[in-house]
Amino acid sequence: MDTQKATFGAGCFWGVEAAFAAIPGVTATAVGYEGGSQENPSYKDVCTQDGQPNRGQPTHVEVVEIDFDPEKVSYGKLLDAFFELHDPTTLNRQGPDWGTQYRSAIFYHSPEQEAEAKAKIEALSIEGRFEPKKIVTQVVPAETFWRAEDYHQRYLEKRGMASCHI
């Protein structure tokens, strides 16, 4: 089986991972950090700046990296789920969580994924699905995925529902 990767930032990664893991055709998920400049960041590094909650300076995004079987689930279906899971019109915020680590982002792994993600955003905008707000989701090339600490992996599966926007 040849799998492909997809990486999404849609707020607190605990609930996002649980939602994607439940989709038939998704073969593996991992939560982590992507899109910042610090190497091998910790959760504390991503969520704080100078000991205070990170509310301004861009840093890594909390993301879910997904392995999926394209014979069983398309990238387009994963994009549909991504836009259902969170509010792509809120800048650096999802539910009660706010800071740049919670920004809406699609990290594409191929030119085809980039084109499909941009086309999906355009279609949603034309459809007016989120009007009067505008979609602020970033569509950027995948960078180094820094796997989050073990206690974050499958967090809701291990601990049950927590304070998460999903």
What are these model-predicted stretches?
Residues 1-166:
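Flexible coil/turn and secondary-structure edge motifs
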